């Protein structure tokens, strides 16, 4: 609350109802009857939760920039941008890069809040800067384990917890030692990639090695897959059916 602008505080005080997480709502000096905690899972109930207060002034709390992998994207998709008034703050990407001295435009962001940790793999290459948006306090340990398994055991890993909050903490670890102690649930993981000499990289280009797939062994060989996909030249959002 102390870090909010006067304009933002005025908006919150004027709102008929304020939605947010338990952590966010606990920071507000606002009467409890005006506060609404998000249900879990959130997305299936998002529209009905907001429409319950149709015609009233609804305020939604977000961390950082709502339009950077945040609730603002879901609200715009569900209700249209014309119904929103977004008050952004610095994103977790900007804050993390500021702490680490990284260039924002040269840092790859991977969101695994609702995705498997292996989603990070295609972004890993020697000297890459990767910022992982975490699901919870266990995510850093999963990331460190993935790095060790993927041939990036020498990478520098920094866990940034509670950014711009009084409890902010940066923990520097290396992917090589075993495990990472459980910390705060509100965190992002910054990886400065260092590859092992013998690592086998998983890329986004066609022709992943056969070992990257699990199954019964009935798999079109890498060279054929590479040539086929190159000829088809798929674009983002398109769907390919492999019928055989």
What name fits each language-model region?
Residues 55-58, 126-218:
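A contiguous loop/helix-start segment that scaffolds small-molecule binding in enzyme catalytic cores
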Residues 10-11, 52-53, 79, 100-103, ...:
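Solvent-exposed alpha-helices and their adjacent loops that cap or buttress functional pockets
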Residues 12-16, 32, 127-128, 186, ...:
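Short, well-ordered alpha-helix to beta-strand connector turns
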Residues 219-236:
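Conserved alpha-helix/loop element of class I SAM-dependent methyltransferases that forms part
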Residues 1-87, 94, 117:
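Class I S-adenosyl-L-methionine
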Residues 237-244:
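Conserved class I S-adenosyl-L-methionine
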Residues 92-128, 135:
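Short, glycine-/small-residue-rich phosphate/pyrophosphate-handling segment
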Residues 17-19, 59, 108, 131, ...:
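Conserved beta-strand elements of the Class I
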């Amino acid at each position: 609350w102390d870090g909010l602008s006067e304009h933002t505080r005025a908006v919150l005080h004027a709102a008929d109802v304020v939605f947010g997480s338990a952590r966010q709502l606990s920071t507000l000096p606002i009467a409890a009857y005006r506060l609404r905690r998000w249900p879990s899972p959130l997305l299936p109930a998002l529209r009905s939760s907001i429409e319950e207060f149709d015609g009233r002034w609804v305020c939604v709390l977000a961390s950082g920039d709502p339009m950077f992998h945040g609730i603002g994207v879901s609200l715009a998709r569900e209700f249209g941008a014309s119904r929103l008034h977004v008050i952004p703050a610095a994103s977790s990407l900007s804050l993390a890069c500021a702490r680490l001295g990284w260039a924002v435009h040269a840092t790859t962001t991977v969101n695994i809040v609702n995705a498997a940790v292996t989603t990070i793999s295609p972004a890993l290459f020697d000297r890459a800067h990767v910022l992982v948006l975490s699901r919870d306090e266990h995510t850093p340990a999963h990331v460190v384990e993935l790095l060790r398994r993927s041939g990036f055991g020498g990478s520098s890993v920094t866990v940034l917890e509670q950014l711009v909050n009084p409890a902010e903490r940066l923990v520097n670890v290396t992917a090589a030692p075993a495990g990472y102690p459980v910390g705060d649930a509100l965190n992002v993981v910054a990886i400065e990639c260092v590859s092992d000499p013998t690592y086998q990289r998983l890329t986004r280009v066609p022709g992943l090695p056969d070992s990257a797939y699990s199954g019964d062994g009935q798999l079109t060989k890498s060279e054929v897959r590479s040539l086929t996909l190159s000829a088809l030249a798929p674009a983002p959002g398109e769907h390919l059916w492999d019928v055989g």
